[in-house]
Amino acid sequence: MASITFGNACTVVFGQVRKEEVTAGPVAVNLNEGTRMVVVPTAAQMATPTPSVSIKIINRWSNKAVSSYERQVEDVFANFFAKKERSDELLTRYYGKVVQKGNKLMVKRAPLHVARVLEKQRLQDIEDEKAFLQYRDAGVHVAGSVKFTDTRSRGQTVSFRTEHYKPTGKIVQKKKAQKQRANADVDHLIDEVMKICSADCKQVEFISMGKRRLTAKFKLFGKSVIPCIHLAHEQGRRLRRELDPRIHEQVIAHLVTGRKVRELIKDDMVTYGWSGAILNKNLFKRTPFRWDEVVIRGRLYGKLVDARSKLSECSKDKIHQYSSFEAQFWKGWKNKFDTLHPHNKDHICEPTINNEKCGEIVATIFQAIHPVIKVSCSTCRERLTKASNEELNEYLATNLACHKATFDDMRQQHATVNTVLNKIEQTSLANPNLKDSMEIVRLLQNLNQTQARQLMKVNNTLLKGNVATSEEFSDATTQLLEVTRWYAKHLSLVDEGSISSFRNKATSKSLINPSLLCDNQLDRNGNFVWGERGRHSKRFFENFFEEVVPGGGYKKYQIRNSPNCTRKLAIGNLIVPMSLERARNALIGESVERLPVTEACVSRVNGAFMHVASCVTSDNGSAHFSPLYSPTKRHLVVGTTGDSKYIDLPATESDKMYVAKEGYCYINIFLAMLVNVNEDSAKDFTKMIRDTIVPMLGTWPSMMDVATACYILTVFHPETKSAELPRILVDHTNKTMHVIDSFGSISTGYHILKAGTVSQLIHFASNELVSEMKHYVVGGEAPHARRMRMEKALIQGIFKPKQLVYLIEEDPYILMMSLVSPTLLINLFNVGGLEVAMKHWIKKEMNIGLIFSMLSSLAQKVSRADLVNEQITMIDANAAQFIETLAGIDVENPMRNELVSALTMMLARSDVDSTLNKTGFTGFSDTLLEMREKNYWRRAQQGMVRAKLVGKIFFNHFLEASAKAYYGTFAKHKATRYRRQVCNLMYLVTWKDQGPIQWSKKCNIRSV
């Protein structure tokens, strides 16, 4: 069945056409079944819409506007390209070549005359082609043939392809080209590499066996390309032979293959910069050489020298080497100039002066601030180095004056040079008013007051003038400020005896003790000889001192107790570490609370200050705090504010170390007085102290009593008045005075008593002396001692029921100290101490009972945690709540204050650790807390062991008593069965197999 489609754009008819020729008339087509024909209407047959008048007007106006705009654009472009320089530039670019430069492609412009010739040829070709297409008769007729086209319609092959047909492109199989490998030996390969390096003047490096390297570079000398070896003298080393001919001969032969000599090279042409150049020896016929190729090193006595030739020591220093000093100079210049340039890049640098002017500016500024004849001359540089500030300023000023004309010329040409030179001239300015400065020195020369020294420093700075540094000007300003403050305060200090005006500086010189200077009392080493005094001093050491047994780091003797506090000795520092870092750590003390100068620091007599019985101050009136005092072995240390004197203790058979017993620290004062006692009176002196003075003073007496005892002793032994005292520190916080012995003091920050002799100390015995310090006791102090005692009492109370009940009733804050350790808290909860304390205090004090309730709840939570860090974190999280509950409860109780201090430290540690963790840092507090917890656990285990030991002892007593009662009442034939029962009972109680019972003679049973 045939079909016809209307509207398709195809005009081809499908079907069968008669074989006969067809005329121009209609063509008959036989349509068979299945044949399809498409009929397309012509333009005349299609409907054409007629536009309205308004649309025509709009179209006409828009077309006119578009045409006008296009003409304007064309005119702009025409005017732009009509310029001759623009057309010439485009013409050279159009006929340029695309070349490769490095890794980039760029257009190389053609010369203008070449471009014009090519353009003229192109226009001529266009004109010829146009003439050919238009058939312009040139008047030449050539006979030929005419080709006619048959216009008759004929049948043709019809394709089924539509207008959307797109042929599939042919896939071309790419054949992989096989890599061609060059077959050549190593020498040929090296020669080819040399030719490549020679073409681009590149650097090449030869590496032989080991670390031997030879660096060479092809350099351009005129039109010739010559290889140059990098020699040792280019790095500043002078060698007798720079190249070994046996090693580098083959390398030189390879380098020669890349050499290109394009012009004649004469002997006089070889100069600086030719160092390492490889030249043929035939170029230098006047100078004989050993090798065919010459490696230029320099000239010696006018003759060229080969780098392979070996020179003598004298010739090595005299040869003129031809290194390229200009390249080295500019290399160093470029390196430091680019490194030291300013960082404020607020503009784009553009060159405005030539290189010659740049060199003049640099040379002018350099000679203005660093005047030398040659920069490389060490003598010129050392002259500037060794010159003082005054000499250097004078030298700079002289140089500027000598070359004033040159410098003035540069000032006028360049404003920057003028600015820099003005700054340099300002440095030579000095203070001309020397007369007034010398008058100030004359007035203040013999004055030692603080203000006089401060004014002297200000005058010295003004006298130096430009020589003074910025630090000296800053210090002078500070000193002037201090003088101004003193003057302002001095106007208001009209009241006599004001604390603000109190000054009690330390003695700058040591006291003189005649007993220590007498030659008859010194041995050949200059040490004090005790004589009979040493034999009688045993009354002190046997009754009031105890022997120091080495071991355990002397921890047993570090803490000294007193009624108000404890004192920590530095005896542990006798163990000297051999590590520098640990040795430096031993010089760090533990500072106590540093108090300012108050009324408690001074002593008065009739309203006036008694300076020897007061605390030492600094120049500005602030308190002078004690430093760390290092320990010594077997010494008596005397001297307070001045330099200390070390006196060997009396010699004994074993040379043991002694430390004063608790409460008898003041014996060190009497031992120091014994140094000044006559040998025939030493026995009476020591017996009087042992039998009369010490029983009268007892332990921890007041300073007033000690001073009175010293007065009594000086009555019987007047020579002891000049005896020097040991160091005495004042602790105003605990109302205590510390007599420091040879074992020093780790605690720092105390006030220092100025009294240096016994006669000065006796002032404290006077009733006319008004001073708080004379009522202070003699003792010492160590930080955290109260906390250690509380922890010790808590651990003992956990395993001692009676002591636990006492703590609950009398001092509940010790039980609250269990917050410092999860181990102590859990053990206290397990023995029922928290529950008993809560029931006891809930009736007496609600807040304390609430704290014990909180402790019980916290102990249950802590016991559920598996890790120590989790337990400590739980306790730290509740520290703030405990502090809030303790607020306002028994504020004056020292135990309560110690507990609050511990909780505050826990809270602060928790806050710091959380802040560090949030910022991404890791602290080491977890490890330290674990180690501390292990110590608490170990101390708790020791208490548990003691409790078990006591239980075993009581159990043994029970077995002994029961056996004795049994054998006294029952028959002895049951002894075997009783032994067996005892063994079973002991196994159940102690969980250990005790073995067969060994009967004792007394009670017929052995002790467990």
UniProtKB/Swiss-Prot annotation:
Any single biological process term in GO: viral translational frameshifting
Signal peptide range: none
Motif Involved in interaction with stylet and aphid transmission, chain ranges: 374-377
Domain notes: The N-terminus of helper component proteinase is involved in interaction with stylets. The central part is involved in interaction with virions and the C-terminus is involved in cell-to cell movement of the virus.
Post-translational modification: Potyviral RNA is expressed as two polyproteins which undergo post-translational proteolytic processing. Genome polyprotein is processed by NIa-pro, P1 and HC-pro proteinases resulting in the production of at least ten individual proteins. P3N-PIPO is cleaved by P1 and HC-pro proteinases resulting in the production of three individual proteins. The P1 proteinase and the HC-pro cleave only their respective C-termini autocatalytically.
Gene Ontology cellular-component terms listed: host cell plasmodesma
EC number: 3.4.21.-, 3.4.22.45
Keyword Transport (UniProt): yes
Domain Peptidase S30 span(s) in chain numbering: 180-322
Stored Pfam families: Peptidase_C6, Peptidase_S30, Potyvirid-P3
Keyword line: Host cell junction, Host-virus interaction, Hydrolase, Inhibition of host innate immune response by virus, Protease, Serine protease, Suppressor of RNA silencing, Transport, Viral immunoevasion, Viral movement protein
Organism of derivation: Peanut mottle virus (strain M)
InterPro entries from the UniProt entry: HC-pro, HC_PRO_CPD_dom, HC_PRO_CPD_sf, Pept_S30_P1_potyvir, Potyvirid-P3
Chloroplast as UniProt keyword: no
Site-annotated residues for Cleavage: 322-323, 779-780
Protein's recorded name: P3N-PIPO polyprotein
Listed GO MF terms: cysteine-type endopeptidase activity; serine-type peptidase activity
PROSITE patterns to which the protein is assigned, alphabetical: HC_PRO_CPD, PV_P1_PRO
Motif (Involved in virions binding and aphid transmission): 631-633
UniProt superkingdom: Viruses
Enzyme class, UniProt record, top EC level: hydrolase
Active site: 233, 242, 275, 665, 738
Family: Belongs to the potyviridae P3N-PIPO polyprotein family.
Record-annotated Peptidase C6 domain positions: 657-779
